[in-house]
């Protein structure tokens, strides 16, 4: 059952948006519309930038509802991975963020493939500066490995986020916020070297480009050359980022930027297998079961721009556009369980392009109603993903000995002999959204929002086109300030996800609907330098495709499986987190997540069973850094830990299991002088052997990194 406050929140959704007819005005005086007054003196501040703050928390974030709210003011479980924390823990790409972010699980499928999970569901939405990007099964292979050199911080909102992200699962949204130019000179060079011949260099420079400082620019470049604890594995990465900001007037700023990331890697696509019923085959962590000619290369180019105007009355308009061209080229191998035991290896070659285009226009600011000040945001967005994959596979299956495999023995197959494969589709989503934060009296804040979406899927390589028209996604939240430190809150959020399965009549099933109910308490200490929260959540995803137990003759005659939108899963649990400054010299972040997920309506053998066995029931993550005092004031020390309960994956008639484990990291840094800083990170101190991706009978098993060391030296202007 949903939490007790369901009915009251559902009733609140009926409230209209009478304030939605307001428009921003540049007039220095207030705009009066009867009882409504837009006050020029009301300003919503956004102090979300974390670079240079030295903090593990942030003052504001807008991912949840499009308004710059503090963590305490947001009626959902939200977190941030700041620039300081990225640097302290030596995070280099998005996988590192996911590994350490509260409540999120990183699942690997080899060195080049990954999946993110939260509250039992797959995360299929990323944002870049607030613009959503789709993450489908194969786009994860092309765009998810974002290098962090160009980002200021990553915001995390757990639960359904349909108001701002549109279609997706009720899991979480990650918002990667880019670095911006500074008006003062800023230059840094960081070089790192570590275990398995891993090397990395970053250069970051920013300054004003004219005397007045109205034109500013920033460039970032990074190069990484990684070997691996896995035999044959290596990767080279090149990252470039450039951005300029121009103040067209005192009120208007135009931003234009571009980035390029190139990854060239030796691929272990198939990765490591389990036995036919999940048995542990006790393979070493260095085992490589692909070939020395295998590769997985990726190229991502992004262009973005936005025009922001700040009106005298405190309102802000923003028009943002982004386009990403992502390519993935792979030629690699995968395993299959052989009849009678053992394994065979087959190969595949695929060229994938994924072009995503995003446009968003919004207007937000304060207004007065019945003598009280409130905030409103209005917007419209359009995003399109054009996906093309061409390639093929080879039917030939070569028997291999997984314990004595030589990557140089099996020759590279001839392209002419492959069985061709092609997948081409275009998904387009358009929407309008609105959210208002009402402040009826001082301790109480009510957020009401809604999104209206149109979704179209065009299968350009076959049949199965479909549309979703006027899908309504509501949002409701209540925050009550107990005192200057603590607030309690409750929220109801939704999200929808289209699906491709068809019913008996041949019609595409209606979208899945995800609902999230959440109640919690948040605390804000030391003027926002430290944030803490505890939340209970209860989520369902309904209308899931459910294969009919008895397939009608009409379905059998057309060689297709028919479904009904009858499946349902439920996820309940707890989120607890504290992050920020405990003292001026002590930064810390600690988070615990409890997830209980199960099938409610599904096949007989699934009903009541665990829905997400590959996400742990208990998950604990913590990181801390302390600056010593006195004669040791140039020294800082830190530690981090990731601990989780058991997980498993269904394999044959059994399970492949991962027992509970904990991974500990240590850090020490030394400030040599005002320009030079040294740091060393010792990861997996106890050399814990664990699966970061649980194996199946055909592969996918990926070990977490063994104990390793990384030295870093940074020069700052």
Task: Label each region the model flagged.
Residues 642-650, 658, 666-717:
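C-terminal beta-signal and adjacent terminal beta-strands/loops
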Residues 105-106, 115, 131-158, 176-178:
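Short acidic/polar hinge/loop motifs at secondary-structure boundaries
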Residues 306-312, 316-322, 326-332, 513-581, ...:
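Membrane-embedded beta-barrel scaffold of Gram-negative outer-membrane proteins
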Residues 442-443, 538, 564-651, 686, ...:
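Gram-negative outer-membrane beta-barrel transporters
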Residues 245-249, 354, 373-377, 381-385, ...:
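Structural signature of Gram-negative outer-membrane beta-barrels, strongest in the C-terminal barrel
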Residues 262-277, 384-389, 478-523, 528-564, ...:
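Surface-exposed extracellular loop regions of Gram-negative outer-membrane beta-barrel proteins
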Residues 224-228, 241-310, 323-354, 397-425, ...:
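Acidic/polar loop-and-plug regions of large Gram-negative outer-membrane beta-barrel proteins
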């Amino acid at each position: 059952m949903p939490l007790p406050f369901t009915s009251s929140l559902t009733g609140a959704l009926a409230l209209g948006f009478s304030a939605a007819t307001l428009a921003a005005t540049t007039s220095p005086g207030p705009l009066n519309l009867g009882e409504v007054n837009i006050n020029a003196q009301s300003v919503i501040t956004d102090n979300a930038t974390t670079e240079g703050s030295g903090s593990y928390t942030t003052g504001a974030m807008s991912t949840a509802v499009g308004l710059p709210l503090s963590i305490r003011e947001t009626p959902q479980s939200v977190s941030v991975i700041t620039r300081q924390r990225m640097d302290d823990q030596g995070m280099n790409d998005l996988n590192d963020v996911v590994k350490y972010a509260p409540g999120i699980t990183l699942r690997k499928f080899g060195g080049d493939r990954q999946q993110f999970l939260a509250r039992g569901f797959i995360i299929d939405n990323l944002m870049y500066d607030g613009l959503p990007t789709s993450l489908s099964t194969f786009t994860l292979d092309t765009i998810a490995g974002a290098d962090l050199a160009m980002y200021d911080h990553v915001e995390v909102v757990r639960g359904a986020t349909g108001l701002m992200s549109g279609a997706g699962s009720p899991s979480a949204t990650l918002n990667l916020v880019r670095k911006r130019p500074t008006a003062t000179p800023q230059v840094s060079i960081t070089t790192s070297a570590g275990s398995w011949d891993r090397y990395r260099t970053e250069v970051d420079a920013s300054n004003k480009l004219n005397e007045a400082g109205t034109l500013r620019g920033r460039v970032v470049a990074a190069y990484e050359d990684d070997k691996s604890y896995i035999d044959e594995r290596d990767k080279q990465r090149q990252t470039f980022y450039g951005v300029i900001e121009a103040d067209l007037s005192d009120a208007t700023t135009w931003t234009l930027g571009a980035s390029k990331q190139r990854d060239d890697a030796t691929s272990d696509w198939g990765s490591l297998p389990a036995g036919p019923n999940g048995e542990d085959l006790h393979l070493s962590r260095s085992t490589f079961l692909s070939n020395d000619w295998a590769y997985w290369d990726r190229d991502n180019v992004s262009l973005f721009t936005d025009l922001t105007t700040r009106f005298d009355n405190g309102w802000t308009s923003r028009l943002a556009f982004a386009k990403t061209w992502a390519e993935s080229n792979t030629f690699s191998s995968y395993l299959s369980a052989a009849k009678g035991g053992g394994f065979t290896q087959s190969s595949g070659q695929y060229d994938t392009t994924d072009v995503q285009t995003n446009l968003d226009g919004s207007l937000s600011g304060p207004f007065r109603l019945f003598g009280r000040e409130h905030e409103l945001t209005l917007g419209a967005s359009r995003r399109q993903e054009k996906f093309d994959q061409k390639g093929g596979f080879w039917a030939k299956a070569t028997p291999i000995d997984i314990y004595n495999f030589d990557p140089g023995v099996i020759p590279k197959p001839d392209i002419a002999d492959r069985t061709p494969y092609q997948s081409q589709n275009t998904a387009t989503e358009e929407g309008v959204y609105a959210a208002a934060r009402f402040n009826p009296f001082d301790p109480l804040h009510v957020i009401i929002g809604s999104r209206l979406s149109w979704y179209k899927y065009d299968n350009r390589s076959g049949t199965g086109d479909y549309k979703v028209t006027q899908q309504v996604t509501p949002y409701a939240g209540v925050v009550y300030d107990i005192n200057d430190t603590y607030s309690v809150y409750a929220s109801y959020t939704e999200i929808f996800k289209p699906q491709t399965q068809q019913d008996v009549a041949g019609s595409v099933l209606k979208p899945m609907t995800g609902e999230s109910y959440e109640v919690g308490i948040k605390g804000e200490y030391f003027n926002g330098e430290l944030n803490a929260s505890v939340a209970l959540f209860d989520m369902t995803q309904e209308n899931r495709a459910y294969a009919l137990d008895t397939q009608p003759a009409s379905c059998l005659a057309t060689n297709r499986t028919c479904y009904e939108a009858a499946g349902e899963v439920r996820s309940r649990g707890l989120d607890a987190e504290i992050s920020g400054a405990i003292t001026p010299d002590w930064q810390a972040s600690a988070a615990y997540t409890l997830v209980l997920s199960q099938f409610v309506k599904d096949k007989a053998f699934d009903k009541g069973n665990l829905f997400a066995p590959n996400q742990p029931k208990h998950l604990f993550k913590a990181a801390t850094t302390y600056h010593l005092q006195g004669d040791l004031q140039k020294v800082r020390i830190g530690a981090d830990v990731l601990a989780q309960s058991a997980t498993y994956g269904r394999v044959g008639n059994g399970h492949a299991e991962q027992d509970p484990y904990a991974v500990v990291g240590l850090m020490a840094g030394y400030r040599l002088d005002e320009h030079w800083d040294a740091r060393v990170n010792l990861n997996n101190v106890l050399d814990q052997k664990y699966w970061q991706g649980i194996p199946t009978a055909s592969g996918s098993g990926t070990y977490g990194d063994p104990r390793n060391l990384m030295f870093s030296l940074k020069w700052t202007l």
